[in-house]
């Protein structure tokens, strides 16, 4: 046994009887047997005391269980005794018997102290001995001070371990910190082994204690293992071995994980492991004291996969004599770090599966001992090798090069002098820091170019680094700090485009070879630039591509004397370190360009060009300063001042006084807006740094009706001066509210001065008091009672108030000083140059130039009376034409525009909805005049009836303004933004200013007071600007929609009264809820209210004056009256109010700083109301009516259905009537879940996911079906009856409950309204518990599915077809939502649920989670919720957006579908938002890598920064219905070439040849990878005519009548041919025919003169013999064709095909086909598909519906496709390929002779007999060949001129359902006119198309474009590519017993038009079609298509057809 010879420590001898003193005699063994206790108790001195009889009595009483007597006796003795020693004895007795009460009495009342020495009679020792844990706790806690005496604890612990008291042991170790590794020792004693806690526990057999100790810091020592071998083994086996997670390779046995780490084992016994050695898969022996191991470890553990031996004292592992002894071949991981190995065991070299080897922190001097390593395989699977912290001097190549799978190598902190030569392995991470490396090998880029990501060669002795290090394409982190580098390789040769971190600190960069600093740094050895004089050296340069990737650059501690210029171009840099470069004195201004830089280290640099105070402020300030320098920034003192206030308050007069210092003489005209300039000099005594401030003053006045318009001129960073008339007193103060709210709404946090005029009208003696009162009123408006700023109002304090007299000018100087002081303190937040004061801020020169250009443009336009706005394109042009323009990116342009807006040069609104942000208004006066036209409309019935104007009338108002048809949409959006004209339908707008201020008739007469009424009051701190206008517009839209729904339901019933429209509320009391209808008699609306009356009740919403002092309303009052007591209308109204506030006025949902809500809802008690109505006195109302707080109602509704009113407790009020929205009474009864049928638990196992705002989604069952339940959790009171009346806690809980109810209601309502196959259906709702049930997605979210499938594939983890279908279904769902005016707002893969991953299923996904969706009432939407990364960049606070935000998210989801990855752009929301707004998008890959061209293009279109450039969901749906979308993979430009050849085998390669003689070269394209594998490889020789690949050789025919055969073995390039053959003519085509003999072929070479040469080939080499077949001879002798016949012309062989299972070869002979019988190698038959001058150009075989072989051929003149039945040689069909619109063409197929015995036999006389229809062929110079046919076909072949007259019109491709069979194309898109299959036979094809209408091309070119190029067999379909680039796809289908052909698709990629004409095409590897295009310059481009067969097309068409059908069904169901 290894390790048994070790001697135990020397103190082992100290085991004696004295050691047993800790264990009292047998008398102490039992709890009762304490009678001898007295005799054993000894004094600290050791002498026994004589026991008094009372002690004996106490013992006896305890012994007899007479506790009370014992306690009485003990207390008596205690009272009598004075001796502390005696009291100590009493404490010991009580402790021994576990009498806790007495122990507490003695400790607390008698103050008995516990001794700290561990004597036998110490009460704590005694208590521990008997195991009284509570007594021990009490005793130890009585000790004074924070620390318990360690000796006492250790003694007690050893004792408790021996006695087996686990609770005491736990208490001592866990609570009091006793150390399980410490010996129990008394004073002046030696430690004894039996007093070691673990030893004592194991010896006494206390297993549970032993395990507890081992788990809390105790270790095995050699004494324990020697003295208790079996118990030790038992413990190790039972408690430290568990079942392994790794699979077992041993049948029937459990795989084991041995965890013997951190036990300080001195040895491992072989016996411990022997019987389980076959089961061990993981063995952890780390952190022990092992000097050696038994021989079985690790070599004999056959199933071992993980071995950890780290932190031991191993000098070596057990030796093995031969490799046969090593049976641990399954080992995957070994950790042998922190040992004493001098070399690795040679046995490791035999572990062929080892993946990870950690051997750091050893004494390795050699890797392996070479002499002992014999016949080893090498660690070929090793991925990670860690050799850090050793003594290695070299890494032997013979070992390193065997590591073929190595991905990570760490050799840091060794003594390596050199690094091994690179070898072939996928190395990703290489760490070699802190060695003695003097050079690095060159060839890193050869082997690790695309793998190595992280390289660390820091702290070495490198003087230079090889170029290859910077040519590693995947390199992300390169650390070279702490070397002796003088220069780096030339940057123009770098290719490390992914580099993120480059650390070059602590080097010699900037020194020359002599050690002296150069004048100009030659840091990078690049080509020197000529400088003045003879100096030629180069600055440090970085390649331009690093600007995209490099984030961290360290150049500190070098010898640089200038910042390299290229550093300033690294725009992505976030950290730059330049410190400790003594020569660096200046920072270039260009550094300011680095917008992402947040860390700039310039420590210990003496920078002269940045002031010290700027440097102190940190990197941001330094960069801002440099940016200002770079951009030639100038101090700008121009600001915008806006003067506002009610009319006739003295605004213009005040302005003139400020400008001139004099009172004006003339009154001003009532213009709406006046603009003027004013310069204010610095007042005397001011300490401001600016001399003067210049204002662009906008004096906004005009009539009161225009007040709402004026808010559009309010912009940020302007100074607002609100002017009011002091003389008008409180009334004028009330009027201020409107202006102050307007300013805060449109320019939050603006600086506002409130200036009172007419000071002279207040009598002097009352002036001070009166002004103080008025000031208090003003402050009361905009500050809360506590003094904090009121929400919704600007921040106005007494410092912002001023008074002035415009008559005697009193206060004018003070006002000037105030304006100057306030202006100088205004901050320029969010500036590009940095946060600074607005006055005197630095503005880039280019912004100021642009300002000048804009002002000049405005001047030019006003002189020419032109329109005063710019479009975004015009502004871009203006920017580009501005001299010195340095505005480059989108963000910078936005900053420039902000500057123009802030200075009053421009007006611009960044809303993206309807493209409003694309207009820039130059002149506010002009805009005001345009708006005045609308305000000049009087409410006449002609133009605007009831305040509603038709869109065409609104357009008429634009005539003469300069707004065009292109910009009217933006103008209308502008009107809606400022509530001037709000859309109420698609073609009508509400003009709120035309509405009367009060209802036009007495509404009170309509409201009959009755009992059946409920009310709701919204009390608001302020009513936001625009609230009523938007509310009334929404109500009009909703009422109209409801009328329409009712009208649709009642289409067949006529209305009794035409003037009456029907209006429906849903929900009635019957059965909780059902549907209830009323007739809407009248709808009346005014500026702040709306009333709808109907038979049996009414509904009214109006403003309520909550506060008399606020003239503007302070709330909303809703009344709903219904004789049927159906109050669900209240839910309808409150929904509208709440959603409007949430979306447009969220400020109202906040609270004041003192916690009071800004908006509160109250419900007057209807019972009180009814009784009050009988009283006449209105003053009594407030006392007699109870107002329920909505919060109370909500909290009560959680638990009960009624609420009690304190005024009539006996009459409870039903909550269902009071707050119907909480009980969802407007929902149909069928949607309420029966709770008894809902089975769900809320355990963790059933959680499917988390929703927003704390909702949880559970898996459940309803009526036996699986469902998903979305549960809204509301916090409950423990005891709601006694809940505190008015606490903040209650308010918070109520707010939480209301939020939950509101979210629940919004989402449930939305789900209820949505019915679409791609949208998750609502199954039902429940109030108790608050939840709704949805369909359950069987496969979870798309994100989960993608992450599960993305591991194995690089693109499209779900496969191509499924990706297409899912993308289509998402777009379809979005299109439906947008049609319903719903903006999803949170589209992401988490919210897309997956139903099926089968491409055959009709529905694969559904959209879910409408928690933050927005209903858009034709007006766009506001709000910033969403998920960063998916959220469109235009979603920002206060920006109105439209449904295009969903299209941005859709683009991101497409990225996920294509890549399988989340669109990650950073970890922080701000970082992501910034990147997206800059136009940075996730990187996907080139189209040829992704291979889904259209979807990738759509993705990029969707995530365009400009919303108007994104497509609509509806247009995406229609795009994706075209099969081209799905089948077009990519196009690949291939440069100039001369010939294209495809391989006929299973390979994906095609080959181009170019040039001739010496310059002849070839290019190989791998179409599977979209890669040019070989580019222009030279292969001299003549120009090619033809090429064929046969097995591993290539046959190449050239124009000099030769065939060269090249071998392809060993992937060597084609250089020297193996063999050359001569032919009598040029070879025009090849064909390889397999022969029955293995590896034998016949190679047929068709020649230009019509001959066919036959070469037998065996094992890749042709035999000597070669035979020829002569077409001419066969024609003459066999088929009797005379020589003068045109068919006997010498036609080149253009096409050959193997037919009839290889028994025949058919080949072209001019217009005919000749058949070779392969068995006798003779021409046996001739077929006549065409007549001369046509020539067969293409030939292919495929199967028909019955699986019989058909041969298709194509010619070059008639453009006709002919089909033969190969077995009978019968011509079965013809199809003309020249139809400009071939989709849906059909042609009949004649049955073959075999099927119909009566049909005539084919002969070979001529073409006429073979025609299956009446066909004539004619040829003319003009039109070429035409086939004139008179068969029933969809294509009219009457003459070619029928195409020369009509453009190719797009047929409406609506789907139709046809009877489907296995190979029928039931899903081909058909015109809706042809509903049944019979009528499909006789379509009418119009022939009114003219050729010149088709396109710019002429007729001949047009017919050329329609010429078919080739016929291809793709699976079971025929593809016919045409010169124009489109592909006709033809299929055969069964048709009432016979067959017919049909064009099932036409594929046309418009992207290919610019690449010329389609020249050739081929099928490669059976499933891919490659078309080659060439233009006039012989530049070629490949278009690669997915080779779809009938099955794929069927799935494709059915997918959208079926979706359409399901959609229609859903609509019908509704």
Swiss-Prot record:
Residues the entry annotates as binding ATP: 1248-1256, 1270
SMART domains hit by this protein: ANK (SM00248), LRR_BAC (SM00364), LRR_TYP (SM00369), S_TKc (SM00220)
GO cellular component: cytosol; mitochondrion; plasma membrane
Phenotype on disruption: Knockout mice are born at the expected Mendelian ratio. At 4 weeks of age, their body length is slightly shorter than that of wild-type littermates. They progressively develop severe osteopetrosis, reduced bone resorption in endocortical and trabecular regions, and increased bone mineralization. Knockout animals have lifelong accumulation of bone, and females are resistant to ovariectomy-induced bone loss. Osteoclasts derived from mutant mice form a reduced area of resorption pits compared to controls, suggesting dysfunction of multinucleated osteoclasts.
GO biological process: bone resorption; intracellular signal transduction; osteoclast development; positive regulation of canonical Wnt signaling pathway; positive regulation of intracellular signal transduction
LRR repeats: 279-300, 303-324, 330-351, 353-374, 381-402, 405-426, 427-447, 451-472, 474-495, 498-519, 549-570, 572-594, 596-617
Domain Roc: 632-826
Modified-residue entries (Phosphothreonine), positions: 1061, 1075
Membrane topology, from the record: Peripheral membrane protein
Region (WD40 loop), start-end ranges: 1791-1906
Primary localization class, coarse: cytoplasm
Sequence ranges of the WD repeats: 1539-1579, 1582-1622, 1623-1668, 1693-1729, 1730-1778, 1779-1948, 1950-1986
Activity regulation annotation text: Activated by phosphorylation by PKC. Binds both GTP and GDP; binding of GTP stimulates kinase activity. Sterically autoinhibited in its dimeric state.
Keyword list, A-Z: ANK repeat, ATP-binding, Cell membrane, Cytoplasm, GTP-binding, Kinase, Leucine-rich repeat, Magnesium, Manganese, Membrane, Metal-binding, Nucleotide-binding, Phosphoprotein, Repeat, Serine/threonine-protein kinase, Transferase, WD repeat
Binding site for GDP: 647-648, 650-653, 670, 758, 760, 806-807
Cell compartment(s), UniProt: Cytoplasm; Cell membrane
Location of region: Disordered: 1839-1895
Boundaries of every Protein kinase domain copy: 1242-1525
Residues at the catalytic site: 1386
Listed EC numbers: 2.7.11.1
Subunit organization: Homodimer. The homodimer is autoinhibited and stabilized by its N-terminal residues and ANK repeats. Interacts with CSK.
Protein name per its UniProtKB record: Leucine-rich repeat serine/threonine-protein kinase 1
Organism: Mus musculus
């Amino acid at each position: 046994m290894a390790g048994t010879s070790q001697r135990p420590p020397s103190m082992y001898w100290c085991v004696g009887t004295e050691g047993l003193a800790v264990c009292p005699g047998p008398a102490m063994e039992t709890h009762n047997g304490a009678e001898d206790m007295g005799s054993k108790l000894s004094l600290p001195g050791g002498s026994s005391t004589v026991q008094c009889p009372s002690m004996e009595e106490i013992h006896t009483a305890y012994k007899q269980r007479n506790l009370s007597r014992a306690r009485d006796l003990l207390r008596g003795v205690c009272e009598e005794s004075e001796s502390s020693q005696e009291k100590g004895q009493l404490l010991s007795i009580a402790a021994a018997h576990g009498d806790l009460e007495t122990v507490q009495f003695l400790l607390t009342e008698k103050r008995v102290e516990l001794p700290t020495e561990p004597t036998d009679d110490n009460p704590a020792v005694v208590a521990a001995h008997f195991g009284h844990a509570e007594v021990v706790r009490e005793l130890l806690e009585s000790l004074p001070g924070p620390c318990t005496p360690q000796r006492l604890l250790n003694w007690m612990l050893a004792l408790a371990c021996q006695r087996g008291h686990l609770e005491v042991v736990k208490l001592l170790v866990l609570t009091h910190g006793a150390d399980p590794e410490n010996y129990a020792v008394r004073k002046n004693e030696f430690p004894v082994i039996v007093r070691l806690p673990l030893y004592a526990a194991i010896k006494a057999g206390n297993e549970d204690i032993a395990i507890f100790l081992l788990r809390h810091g105790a270790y095995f020592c050699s004494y324990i293992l020697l003295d208790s071998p079996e118990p030790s083994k038992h413990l190790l086996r039972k408690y430290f071995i568990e079942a392994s997670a790794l699979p077992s390779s041993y049948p029937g046995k459990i795989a084991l994980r041995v965890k013997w780490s951190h036990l300080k084992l001195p040895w491992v016994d072989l016996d411990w492991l022997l019987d389980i050695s076959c089961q061990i898969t993981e063995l952890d022996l780390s952190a022990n004291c092992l000097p050696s191991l038994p021989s079985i470890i690790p070599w004999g553990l056959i199933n071992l996969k993980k071995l950890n031996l780290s932190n031991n004292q191993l000098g070596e592992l057990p030796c093995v004599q031969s490799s046969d002894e090593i049976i641990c071949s399954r080992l995957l991981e070994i950790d042998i770090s922190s040992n004493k190995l001098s070399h690795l065991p040679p046995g490791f070299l035999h572990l062929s599966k080892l993946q990870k080897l950690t051997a750091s922190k050893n004494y390795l001097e050699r890797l392996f001992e070479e002499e002992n390593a014999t016949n080893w395989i090498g660690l070929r699977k090793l991925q990670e090798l860690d050799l850090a912290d050793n003594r290695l001097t070299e890494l032997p190549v013979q070992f390193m090069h065997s590591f073929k799978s190595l991905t990570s190598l760490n050799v840091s902190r060794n003594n390596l002098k050199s690094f091994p030569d690179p070898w072939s392995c996928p190395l990703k991470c290489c760490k070699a820091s802190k060695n003695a490396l003097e050079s690095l090998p060159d060839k890193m880029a050869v082997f690790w170019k695309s793998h190595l990501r992280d390289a660390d060669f820091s702290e070495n002795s490198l003087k230079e680094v090889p170029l290859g290090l910077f040519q590693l394409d995947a390199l992300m982190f390169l650390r070279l700090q702490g070397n002796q580098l003088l220069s780096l390789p030339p940057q123009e040769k770098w290719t490390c485009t992914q580099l993120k971190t480059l650390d070059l600190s602590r080097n010699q960069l900037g020194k020359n070879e002599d050690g002296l600093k150069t004048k100009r740094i030659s840091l990078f050895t690049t080509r020197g630039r000529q400088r003045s004089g003879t100096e030629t050296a180069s600055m440090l340069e970085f390649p331009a591509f690093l600007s995209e990737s490099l984030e961290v650059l360290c150049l500190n501690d070098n010898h640089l004397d200038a910042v390299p210029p290229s550093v300033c171009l690294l725009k992505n840099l976030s950290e730059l370190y330049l410190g400790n470069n003594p020569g660096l004195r200046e920072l270039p201004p260009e550094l300011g360009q680095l917008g992402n830089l947040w860390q700039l280290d310039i420590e210990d640099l003496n920078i002269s060009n940045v002031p010290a105070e700027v440097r102190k402020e940190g990197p941001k300030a330094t960069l801002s300063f440099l940016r200002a320098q770079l951009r030639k920034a100038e101090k700008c003192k121009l600001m915008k001042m806006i003067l506002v206030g009610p009319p006739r308050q003295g605004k213009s007069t005040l302005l003139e006084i400020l400008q001139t210092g004099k009172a004006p003489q003339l009154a001003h005209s009532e213009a709406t807006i006046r603009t003027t300039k004013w310069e204010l000099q610095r007042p005397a005594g001011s300490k401001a740094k600016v001399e003067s401030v210049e204002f662009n003053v906008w004096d906004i006045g005009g009539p009161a009706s225009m007040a709402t318009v004026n808010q559009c001129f309010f912009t940020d960073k302007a100074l607002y001066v609100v002017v009011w008339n002091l003389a008008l007193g409180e009334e004028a103060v009330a009027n201020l509210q409107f202006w102050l709210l307007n300013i805060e709404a449109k320019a939050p946090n603006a600086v506002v001065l409130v200036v009172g005029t007419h000071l002279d009208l207040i009598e002097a003696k009352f002036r001070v008091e009166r002004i103080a009162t008025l000031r208090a009123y003003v402050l009361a408006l905009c500050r809360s009672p506590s003094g904090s700023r009121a929400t919704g109002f600007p921040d106005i304090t007494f410092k912002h108030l001023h008074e002035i007299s415009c008559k005697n000018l009193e206060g004018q100087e003070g006002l000037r000083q105030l304006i100057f002081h306030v202006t100088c303190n205004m901050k320029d937040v969010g500036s590009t140059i940095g946060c600074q004061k607005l006055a005197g801020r630095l503005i880039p020169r280019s912004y100021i130039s642009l300002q000048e250009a804009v002002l000049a443009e405005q001047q030019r336009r006003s002189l020419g009376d032109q329109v005063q706005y710019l479009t975004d394109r015009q502004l871009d042009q203006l920017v580009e034409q501005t001299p010195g323009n340095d505005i480059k990116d989108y963000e910078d342009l936005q900053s420039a525009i902000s500057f123009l807006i802030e200075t009053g040069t421009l007006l611009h609104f960044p809303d993206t909805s309807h493209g409003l942000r694309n207009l820039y208004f130059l002149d506010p006066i002009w805009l005001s005049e345009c708006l005045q036209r609308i305000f000049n409309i009087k409410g006449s019935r002609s133009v605007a009836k009831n305040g509603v104007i038709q869109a065409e009338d609104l357009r008429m108002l634009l005539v003469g303004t300069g707004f065009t048809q292109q910009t009217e949409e933006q103008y209308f959006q502008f009107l809606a933004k400022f509530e001037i004209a709000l859309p109420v339908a698609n073609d009508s707008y509400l003009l709120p200013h035309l509405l009367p201020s009060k209802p036009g008739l007495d509404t009170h007469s309509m409201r009959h007071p009755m009992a059946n009424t409920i009310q709701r009051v919204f009390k608001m701190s302020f009513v936001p600007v625009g609230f009523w206008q938007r509310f009334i517009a929404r109500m009009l839209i909703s009422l109209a929609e409801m009328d329409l729904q009712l009208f649709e339901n009642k289409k067949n019933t006529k209305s009794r009264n035409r003037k009456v429209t029907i209006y429906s509320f849903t929900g009635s009391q019957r059965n909780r809820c059902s549907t209830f209808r009323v007739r809407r008699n009248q709808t009346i609306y005014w500026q702040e209210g709306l009333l709808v009356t109907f038979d049996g009740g009414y509904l009214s919403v109006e403003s309520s004056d909550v506060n008399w002092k606020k003239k503007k309303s302070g709330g909303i009052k809703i009344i709903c009256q219904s004789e049927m007591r159906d109050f669900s209308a209240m839910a309808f109204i409150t929904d509208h109010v709440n959603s409007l506030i949430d979306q447009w006025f969220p400020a109202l949902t906040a609270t004041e700083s003192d916690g009071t809500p800004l908006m509160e809802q109250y419900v007057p008690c209807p019972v009180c109301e009814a009784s009050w109505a009988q009283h006449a006195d209105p003053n009594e109302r407030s006392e007699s009516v109870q107002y329920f707080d909505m919060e109370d109602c909500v909290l009560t509704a959680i638990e009960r259905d009624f609420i009690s009113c304190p005024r009539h407790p006996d009459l409870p009020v039903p909550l269902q009537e009071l707050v119907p929205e909480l009980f969802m009474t407007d929902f149909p009864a069928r949607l309420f879940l029966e709770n008894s049928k809902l089975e769900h638990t809320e355990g963790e196992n059933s959680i499917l996911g988390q929703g927003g705002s704390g909702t949880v989604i559970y898996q459940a069952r309803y009526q036996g079906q699986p469902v998903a339940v979305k549960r809204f959790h509301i916090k409950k009171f423990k005891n709601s009856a006694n809940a505190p009346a008015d606490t903040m806690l209650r308010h918070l809980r109520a707010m939480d409950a209301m939020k939950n109810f509101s979210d629940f209601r919004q989402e449930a309502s939305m789900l209820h309204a949505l019915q679409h196959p791609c949208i998750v259906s609502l199954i039902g709702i429940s109030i108790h518990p608050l939840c709704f049930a949805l369909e359950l997605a069987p496969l979870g979210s798309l994100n989960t599915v993608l992450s599960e499938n993305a591991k194995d594939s690089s693109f499209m983890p779900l496969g191509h077809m499924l990706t297409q279908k899912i993308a289509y279904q998402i777009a379809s769902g979005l299109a439906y939502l947008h049609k319903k005016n719903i903006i999803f707002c949170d589209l992401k893969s988490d919210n897309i649920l997956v139903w099926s991953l089968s491409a055959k299923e009709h529905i694969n996904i559904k959209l879910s989670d409408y928690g933050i969706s927005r209903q858009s009432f034709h007006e766009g939407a506001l709000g910033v919720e969403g998920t960063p990364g998916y959220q469109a960049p235009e979603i920002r606070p206060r920006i109105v957006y439209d449904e295009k935000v969903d299209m941005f998210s859709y683009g991101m989801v497409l990225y996920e579908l294509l890549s399988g990855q989340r669109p990650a752009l950073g970890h922080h929301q701000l970082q992501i938002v910034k990147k997206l707004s800059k136009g940075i998008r996730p990187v996907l890959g080139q189209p040829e890598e992704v291979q889904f061209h259209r979807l990738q293009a759509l993705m990029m279109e969707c995530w365009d920064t400009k919303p108007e450039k994104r497509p609509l969901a509806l247009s995406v749906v229609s795009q994706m219905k075209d099969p081209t979308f799905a089948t077009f993979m990519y196009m690949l430009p291939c440069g100039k070439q001369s010939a294209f050849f495809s391989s006929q085998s299973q390979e994906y390669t095609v080959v181009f040849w170019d040039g001739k003689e010496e310059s002849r070269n070839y290019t190989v394209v791998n179409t599977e990878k979209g890669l040019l594998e070989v580019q222009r490889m030279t292969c001299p020789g003549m120009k090619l005519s033809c090429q064929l690949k046969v097995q591993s050789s290539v046959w190449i025919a050239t124009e000099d009548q030769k065939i060269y055969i090249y071998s392809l073995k060993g992937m060597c390039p084609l250089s020297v041919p193996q063999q050359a053959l001569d032919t009598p003519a040029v070879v025009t085509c090849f064909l390889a025919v397999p022969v029955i003999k293995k590896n034998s072929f016949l190679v047929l070479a068709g020649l230009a003169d019509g001959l066919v040469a036959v070469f037998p080939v065996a094992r890749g080499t042709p035999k000597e013999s070669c035979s020829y077949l002569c077409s001419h001879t066969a024609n003459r002798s066999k088929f009797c064709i005379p020589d003068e016949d045109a068919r006997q012309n010498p036609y080149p062989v253009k096409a050959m095909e193997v037919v009839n299972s290889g028994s025949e070869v058919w080949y072209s002979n001019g217009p005919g086909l000749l058949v070779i019988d392969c068995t006798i190698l003779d021409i046996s038959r001739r077929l006549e598909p065409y007549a001369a001058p046509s020539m067969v150009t293409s030939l292919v075989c495929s199967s028909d519906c019955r699986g019989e072989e058909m041969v298709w051929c194509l010619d070059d003149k008639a453009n006709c496709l002919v089909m033969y039945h190969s077995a009978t040689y019968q011509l079965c069909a013809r199809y003309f390929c020249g139809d400009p619109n071939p989709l849906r063409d059909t042609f009949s197929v004649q049955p073959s002779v075999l099927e119909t015995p009566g049909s005539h036999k084919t002969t070979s006389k001529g073409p006429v007999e073979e025609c299956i229809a009446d066909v004539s062929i004619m040829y003319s110079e003009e039109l070429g060949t035409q086939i004139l046919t008179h068969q029933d076909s969809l294509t009219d072949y009457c003459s070619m001129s029928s195409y020369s007259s009509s453009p190719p019109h797009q047929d409406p491709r609506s789907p139709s359902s046809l009877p489907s069979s296995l190979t029928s194309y039931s899903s081909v898109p058909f015109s809706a006119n042809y509903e049944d299959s019979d009528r499909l036979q006789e379509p009418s094809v119009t022939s009114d198309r003219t050729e010149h209408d088709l396109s710019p091309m002429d007729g001949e070119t047009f017919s050329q474009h329609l010429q078919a190029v080739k016929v291809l067999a793709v699976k079971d379909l025929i593809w016919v590519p045409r010169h124009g680039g489109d592909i006709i796809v033809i299929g055969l289908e069964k048709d009432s017993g016979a067959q017919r052909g049909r064009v099932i698709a036409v594929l046309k990629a418009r992207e290919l038009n610019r690449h010329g004409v389609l020249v050739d095409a081929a099928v490669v590897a059976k499933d891919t079609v490659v078309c080659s295009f060439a233009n006039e310059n012989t530049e070629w481009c490949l278009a690669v298509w997915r080779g779809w067969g009938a099955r794929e097309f069927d799935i494709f068409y059915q997918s959208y057809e079926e979706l359409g059908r399901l959609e229609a069904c859903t609509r019908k169901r509704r």
